[in-house]
Amino acid sequence: FWDFWIMAFKDYDSKKVINYKIVSNENNTDYKNWVKELQEQWWVIRAIVCDWRKWLLWWFQDIPTQMCNFHQVAIIRRYITKKPILEANRELKSLTELLTKTDKESFSFWLWEWYEKHKDFLSEKVIWKDWKMHYLHNRTRSAYFSLKNNLQYLFVRYDNIWKIDIPNTTNWLEWVFGHIKAKVSLHRWLKKERKIKLILSLLYGKN
């Protein structure tokens, strides 16, 4: 919200925002401490769905933590663009778009197939102006390794499908914030305190 952040926890079952914090910036430690606070208040946290926050995903090893699949898709698009030209990038984009529609084993196999097909392409190097060897297709490599390294968090829903219903995206919370941002943008002249009051009324009005 331009000059401050609102961190929110929304309960998937009840569809209600159960807590929020207003902070000057967003960081993993705040989320970690907040989860601990909720647990101390006797909340039973059966699973967490979040956007890409590497340390946050790693910290909660005792709680199934699903990475939002659409955030992963967005990460890949930032690396290889929405309309990639190179064949390897086009194929990787198409593969990534299957994230929300397939299972862990199939996706892992397809990613391995893609790598085997393009590993020579990924390994290509050139000498730059500093007279050092650099990978030629750095952005493609970054996109691939992002998928590979995050794979264990992208299918937590699938791994726990018989235990608990975990969504694989944060769309249900993103929609709430999208609606709020649209409303708040109409009142940019409001002072911070009034703006926060408006946001909170909208936030809880969506409960």
Annotate each language-model stretch with its function.
Residues F1-V49, K54, W58, N150-L154, ...:
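RNase H-like nuclease fold core
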Residues D11, S24, P64, A74, ...:
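A short beta-strand motif that forms part of the nucleic acid-binding face
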Residues K15, W43-R53, F60, K93-N207:
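Acidic/histidine-rich catalytic cores and adjacent linkers
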Residues E26, L86, H187-W189:
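A short hydrophobic/aromatic micro-motif that marks alpha-helical segments and, especially, helix-coil
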Residues N28-T29, I76-K82, W172-L173, H179, ...:
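A generic structural micro-environment signature
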Residues A47-K93:
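Conserved beta-strand -> loop -> alpha-helix junction used to position metal-binding or nucleic-acid-contacting
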